[in-house]
Amino acid sequence: MSNNLLKGKKGIIFGALNDMSIAWKVAERAHEEGATFTLTNAPIAMRMGALNELAEKTNSQIIPADATSVEDLKNLFSQSQEILGGKIDFVLHSIGMSPNVRKKKDYTDLNYEWYKKTLDVSAMSLHKVLKVASETDAINEWGSVVALTYIAAQRIFPDYNDMADAKSLLESITRSFGYHYGTSNKVRVNTISQSPTVTTAGSGVSGFDKFIDFSENMSPLGNAGSLDCANYCISMFSDLTKYVTMQNLFHDGGFSSTGVTNAVMDRFGE
């Protein structure tokens, strides 16, 4: 169902890999709501995914870019404005990876070069996106930038490893840059802290299936799915949320405010 919430708006969507990706769902919903946008991912990620299929489905163009490269980002924003015919109204940052998680390194024994890579790709890339956008005046007033995060930024989930540190930095960048970008250009910057979601990236975390089951039982409304997250992103890109900025917005069925549930307690008696 379309309400034309994004009619006439132009955007850039980072991080769609395949139809399991939240970014993929956001692109589909943004298209349904009347937006035009470009799609981007790192060249190495594009070889692993099916971005061409999404581009065809949403009538979008793909611009490969390494989000850790300022030069790539300058080219991305420049080309996107040329393709879309004007400044950008919304950006989705859905980027995250950890070599330490992939290689199953213990948090107390991290490979520090991999650690720096995790922080650069998963968090500092947002700072670079915002820096390039602000310096080139690429985003319209009242534009919206949304980055996806996870509650492990604030609480311990052992197997989430150094990605938890990256998400903490991501949320801090959102607040800090959100202040400056709001003051100078009235651009809003927020993070959405999503329920554990079955994606290619999430599935790489040890014990992920068990944790999804736990989270489902710990959330009064149950886990929020990827489509529901996409719908929340659409609302954040729309004019209905013009005065929301510098926030970490939980989209998790109530998990973040729940100490314990009867469903979880009952399992201790089994």
Where are the regions that the model predicts?
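Canonical Rossmann dinucleotide-binding motif of NAD(H)/NADP(H)-dependent dehydrogenases/reductases
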Residues: 3-40
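Conserved glycine-rich Rossmann-like NAD(P)H-binding loop of the short-chain dehydrogenase/reductase
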Residues: 35-51
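Conserved mid-core segment of classical short-chain dehydrogenase/reductases
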Residues: 56-57, 63-74, 78-118, 135, ...
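Short, small/polar-rich loop/turn modules that mediate ligand/substrate recognition or access, typified
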Residues: 142, 183-188, 244-246
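Hydrophobic structural elements of the Rossmann-like NAD(P)H-binding subdomain
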Residues: 13, 92, 146, 189-192, ...
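C-terminal helical subdomain
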Residues: 124, 191, 209-244, 249-253
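Short C-terminal tail/terminal secondary-structure segment
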Residues: 245-270
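Catalytic loop of short-chain dehydrogenase/reductase
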Residues: 15-25, 96-183, 193-199, 216, ...
